[in-house]
Regions:
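Bacterial Sec-dependent N-terminal signal peptides
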Residues: 1-18
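Short, low-complexity intrinsically disordered segments
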Residues: 1-4, 92, 215, 242
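Primarily secretory-pathway and cell-envelope proteins
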Residues: 18-100, 141-232, 257-259, 272-285
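Short, solvent-exposed, Trp/other aromatic-anchored flexible loops in extracytoplasmic proteins
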Residues: 100-133, 145, 217-265
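A short tyrosine-centered beta-strand micro-motif
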Residues: 132-141, 263-273
């Protein structure tokens, strides 16, 4: 269980050269010139608890060695279980309940499909301090990869309707002229949702066909955290031009690869990575 490193511990160690991306770090970080992000008015909450967590009992003893959470996919897309943490109530505020130093976790590898319930074990040996009589909050998130398709022609960009996502999350390409791909994501749950990076643009045969789309760079993830975290009932629109300035690409091979300077007519796969956050409370008496 305690084998590898938290995702958030891994990300800061990434170097620009570790990312299979055609732009230099300085160009990656020109976020506003790559993609436009627009937050939209509230949407209807139709799937309030698409994912839920609950403790198996509401009250625990200070001598408790392990707390088991049930992670439930009520009505959301398949998601991968990630990691937990605890908070404690201090003077009317939720404050972090610290882990022991240098604690590492094995995460990932457990998929939660619609209708499934999976356990998450919280071992008190992971934390610096024992439980004391108080109120506590358990926090957890799951990771989902969603996608949809569109067709780009010489005159327009049209969504492929049968690939559009609806339900807990709506994800689709809006019809537009052929100058920009407009990607709509709507959160119809009452949960907070974080798009991790910019949307990706690929084909069924080739990943990453647009040099200004998703980079995977930690700075891009931090940029998204500051601008694109959505509360329940919020939505966001991404606008990505179909053309790019080849001169912003420095590597000779990458410049040749993207020398057309624009997406050609064809079918494109649009992807988005999501973190979906949940919490539940329990007491220690």
């Amino acid at each position: 269980y305690l084998l590898s490193v938290y995702l958030f511990c891994l990300l800061p160690k990434l170097q620009a050269q570790d990312i299979d991306f055609p732009l230099s770090l300085s160009e990656i970080e020109k976020y506003e010139s790559r993609i436009r992000i627009q937050r939209l008015p509230a949407v209807t909450i139709t799937h309030a608890d698409a994912y839920k967590i609950r403790t198996r009992q509401p009250v625990y003893s200070p001598r408790t060695k392990e707390i088991v959470l049930d992670i439930i996919n009520m009505d959301g897309p398949t998601a991968e279980l990630e990691y937990h943490n605890l908070k404690q109530m201090v003077n009317g505020k939720w404050l972090g309940f610290p882990f022991i130093d240098n604690l590492v976790f094995a995460i990932g590898g457990r998929d939660l499909s619609k209708g499934d319930t999976l356990p998450e074990h919280i071992r008190m040996s992971e934390f610096k301090y024992p439980l004391k009589p108080n109120r506590y909050q358990a926090n957890f998130y799951v990771f989902a990869n969603i996608h949809t398709y569109c067709n780009l022609t010489g005159k327009s960009i049209v969504s492929i309707k049968e690939t559009e996502m609806d339900g807990a999350f709506a994800f689709k390409v809006l019809p537009s002229n052929n100058d920009s791909i407009r990607i709509l994501f709507e959160n119809h749950t009452n949960l907070e949702v974080q798009p991790v990076f910019f949307p990706s643009i690929s084909t069924d045969e080739r990943y990453m066909v647009h040099p200004f789309a998703r980079s995977g760079w930690v700075g891009e993830a931090n940029y998204m955290k500051s601008r694109a975290r959505l509360k329940g009932g919020e939505a966001i629109l991404f606008t990505i031009p179909v053309s790019w300035d080849v001169n912003r690409i420095t590597d000779r091979n990458d410049k040749k690869r993207f020398q057309a300077g624009r997406l050609l007519s064809g079918k494109y796969r649009i992807g988005l990575q999501l973190e979906i956050y949940m919490d539940t409370e329990f007491e220690v008496k």
